[in-house]
């Protein structure tokens, strides 16, 4: 919440290991981990947003433009993940995690070189961020904050926007994983689509 980055990069690998230990079918382990990770961002994002709102850092015009695209992108991200095998998803997520680790380890930060585009351009950027976030099972902060910083948005506003935008990503992404996994015969008990309720409740 402090840095606008959710816990998906930690939650997803832990869930993958946990589901593997429980004997969940290998072909759905990663999908189940991604689908279970996203709903947690609704709760953490709301809590973080309240704090940023009280601090007066929330730019609702910018958030509405980003959020509209993120809703569409996150739904498509979940549908895309459903088309990929667990092994392919693992490779994609691993590459993303290494990229984030290198970025933080080398302290690579985008320079403010431009300004936010208009409503359409901002919405398209939101859709891309939402698509990738749902594909990786994260709230989007690791992409939203750098994108907004690159577009000369002050850091406090960028972090606040990231917290707010994690909720439409989490909502649309969760629904897409629920829909994609509905009725899958290999799901463990207490699953709703690709969302495993006991793990979700434990994380929240």
Model-derived regions, located:
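Juxtamembrane transmembrane-helix boundary motif
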Residues: 1-3, 10-31, 36, 45-136, ...
């Amino acid at each position: 919440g402090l840095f606008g980055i959710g816990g998906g990069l930690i939650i997803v690998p832990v869930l993958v290991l946990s589901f593997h230990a429980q004997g969940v079918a290998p072909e759905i382990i990663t999908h189940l981990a991604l689908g279970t990770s996203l709903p947690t961002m609704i709760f953490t994002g709301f809590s973080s947003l309240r704090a940023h709102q009280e601090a007066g850092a929330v730019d609702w015009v910018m958030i509405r433009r980003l959020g509209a695209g993120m809703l569409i992108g996150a739904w498509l991200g979940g549908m895309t993940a459903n088309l990929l095998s667990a092994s392919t998803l693992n490779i994609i997520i691993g590459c993303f995690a290494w990229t984030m680790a290198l970025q933080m380890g080398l302290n690579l930060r985008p320079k403010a070189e431009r300004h936010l585009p208009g409503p359409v351009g901002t919405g398209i950027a939101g859709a891309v961020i939402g698509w990738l976030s749902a594909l990786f099972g994260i709230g989007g902060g690791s992409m939203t904050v750098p994108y907004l910083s690159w577009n000369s948005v002050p850091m406090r506003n960028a972090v606040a926007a990231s917290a707010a935008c994690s909720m439409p990503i989490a909502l649309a992404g969760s629904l897409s994983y629920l829909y994609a996994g509905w009725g899958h015969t290999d799901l463990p008990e207490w699953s709703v689509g690709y969302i495993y309720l006991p793990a979700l409740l434990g994380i929240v």
